[in-house]
Every structure is written in structure tokens, then in C-alpha cells.
Amino acid sequence: MRNAKITRKTKETDIQMELELDGTGSSNIDTGIGFFDHMLTSFAKHGNLDLIIEATGDLIVDEHHLIEDTAIVLGQALSEALGDKDGIARFGDARIPMDEALADVVLDLGGRTYLVMKAEFEAPRVGEMNTQLVRHFFESLTDNSKMNLHIAVTGYNDHHKIEALFKAFAYALRRAVKIEGEGIKSTKGVL
């Protein structure tokens, strides 16, 4: 089983997460940030991941700490669930539309952390989520999963753009974690 159970408790947040890479897309997510919950639910569904997240935090301040720490824990869970990465495809990509929005995501689970993100948002918020935190979410996730991630999105509706990004990320990850045989896909012999 390729799964992980991670807990992170700080003075700012308390997060419990369970992740199953070879799941069915079921999820139970409660961060207290409705739009963020919607994005994570969509991520689980389209990534065919089973994902449980119970997260609380200092939302009275703002949503920054909770979104950042959720991304940290998700990155750690991905890394733990992948183990030594034996047999995984390693690379994944997806191009996903949502109405006028079009998201492109390409990733490499080879252990080199890097994020390139080309996305502009017009509105300061979508629901209860600050749009600046979309980039911060993916930065924190890549740092903690040791993933190289390239993201680009076009469109004019920020909800559609963000949702297309999360769906494209889910499909790209789904392809990258797929078992394609045996062995490590690296000339170094390790990922």
C-alpha cells in the first residue's frame, strides 16, 4: 500500500492527513476554508487519491498559515507514500480546460525541488481564499515533496483558473505516480 498518515501541530495550526495514492478519489476534507476544501476535494477526485484532511488554524489572523501548513503536510505525505519511488513513471503532465480557463501542468518526481508558475489572478480573493496563496500552496508542496513543477494558466475567471490548475495538477500527479514496472527511472539509480 502506498499511503501515509501525517500529523503537524504548531502554535498556528493542527493538521491530520491520510493519503492513499492508489485510491478511488474519495475524500473528506475540512480546513475551514470553503474554496480551499473545494480545490482539495477536486484534487483528490481527479488524482484518484483517497485523501482525509482535518485542519484547524488561526483563521482569525488569516488563511496563510493553514494553507501553507496543509501544503507542507501534503508534500510530506506524497513523499512518504512514494517511498523509494521504485517503478513509478516519475514524469506527468496534463492540460485541463474549465470553460475559458486552460491550465498546463508538467511535473517530475525526481527529487529536485523547483516551481515555475505562470498565473495571474485579478481578484484578491476567491471565496475565503486569498489568491496570492495559490502560488504559496504550490511552493510549499514542491519544497516538501521534492518535486519539480511547472504550471501555467490562462483565462479571466479566477475561480475557473484556480480549479483548472488543481485538476491539471491532479492528473499530472496521477500519471507520475503510476507504477510502470520495476526499477528507478534515473541513471543515478535513486530519485
From Swiss-Prot:
InterPro entries registered for this protein in UniProt: IGPD_sf, ImidazoleglycerolP_deHydtase, ImidazoleglycerP_deHydtase_CS, Ribosomal_Su5_D2-typ_SF
A GO term from the CC aspect: cytoplasm
Name of the top EC class for this enzyme: lyase
A Pfam family hit: IGPD
CDD domains tied to this protein: IGPD
Any GO molecular function: imidazoleglycerol-phosphate dehydratase activity
Subcellular location: Cytoplasm
Gene3D superfamilies: Imidazole glycerol phosphate dehydratase, domain 1
Swiss-Prot/TrEMBL keywords: Amino-acid biosynthesis, Cytoplasm, Histidine biosynthesis, Lyase
Major localisation: cytoplasm
Substrates-to-products reaction catalysed: D-erythro-1-(imidazol-4-yl)glycerol 3-phosphate = 3-(imidazol-4-yl)-2-oxopropyl phosphate + H2O
Highest rank taxon of the organism: Archaea
PROSITE patterns hit by this protein: IGP_DEHYDRATASE_1, IGP_DEHYDRATASE_2
Signal peptide region: none
Pathway: Amino-acid biosynthesis; L-histidine biosynthesis; L-histidine from 5-phospho-alpha-D-ribose 1-diphosphate: step 6/9
GO BP of this protein: L-histidine biosynthetic process
EC number: 4.2.1.19
Membership in a protein family: Belongs to the imidazoleglycerol-phosphate dehydratase family.
Name of the protein in its database record: Imidazoleglycerol-phosphate dehydratase
